[in-house]
Structures are given as C-alpha cells and as structure tokens.
Amino acid sequence: MLLNTKQMRLRRAKATRIKIGNSRQFRLSVHKSNNHIYAQILDPSSNRVIVSASTVEAEVKKQYPSGGTIEAAKYVGHLVAKKSIESQIYEVAFDRSGFKYHGRIKALADAARSAGMKF
C-alpha cells in the first residue's frame, strides 16, 4: 500500500491523538505550512481553544515577516508558553499533528519548554 506524504502524516497524527486522547491533559497542538506555524492549547473535555499563537499575528509578523523560519517558530513557542502561563496552564501534552519532531516543530517545543511549560 503506497501512501503519499500527507497521508503518512495524517496516519501518524491519528496514532498520536489516540495516545493523548486517553490522558485528561491540556493539549498543545502544532500545525505548520511552508509559510507559517500555528500553536494552540486545547481543553481536553471540550476541545475548545484556550490559548493560541501563530506567525500570522501582527505582533509576530512585525519581527518575522517570513513566518516559515526556525526563529519565528521559537518566538511562537515562547509566545504560546507565556499566554498559557497567564491562563494558569503549566503542563500540556504535545501534539505535533503527525509532523516529525525536527526543525521548526522542535524549535517551537524547545522554546515553550524554556519559557516554563512542561510536557
């Protein structure tokens, strides 16, 4: 069975979400495109967005006009961690949405950890 790249990513995402879904923790969900990166913290019971940050926000776009860089991902990670700590969310489960833990995804996760989040 041959799968293309998107189908393989969605398959990995499904497996990860099954593992995370069993825990009753807040979920830090990350999505990336070629030009932007998005991070959201979701409530475990209702799947509602509590906190979000992305490279399309005006604050981030001022500093990083090109949102597809590792530096922009680090800034988004720091920003989402800062917002979550203000909302008194300190511990989350990391949902990388099937993306490999490398590059911008890793940079965002490391920046969020260094800003005080635990996962």
UniProtKB/Swiss-Prot annotation:
One of its GO terms (molecular function) is structural constituent of ribosome. Keywords: Ribonucleoprotein, Ribosomal protein, RNA-binding, rRNA-binding. One of its GO terms (biological process) is translation. One of its GO terms (cellular component) is cytosolic large ribosomal subunit. InterPro entries: Ribosomal_uL18_bac-type (IPR004389), Ribosomal_uL18_bac/euk (IPR005484). Gene3D superfamilies: 3.30.420.100. Signal peptide: none annotated. This is one of the proteins that bind and probably mediate the attachment of the 5S RNA into the large ribosomal subunit, where it forms part of the central protuberance. PANTHER family: 39S RIBOSOMAL PROTEIN L18, MITOCHONDRIAL, LARGE RIBOSOMAL SUBUNIT PROTEIN UL18M. Belongs to the universal ribosomal protein uL18 family. This is Large ribosomal subunit protein uL18. It comes from Nitrosomonas europaea (strain ATCC 19718 / CIP 103999 / KCTC 2705 / NBRC 14298). The lineage of its organism: Bacteria, Pseudomonadati, Pseudomonadota, Betaproteobacteria, Nitrosomonadales.
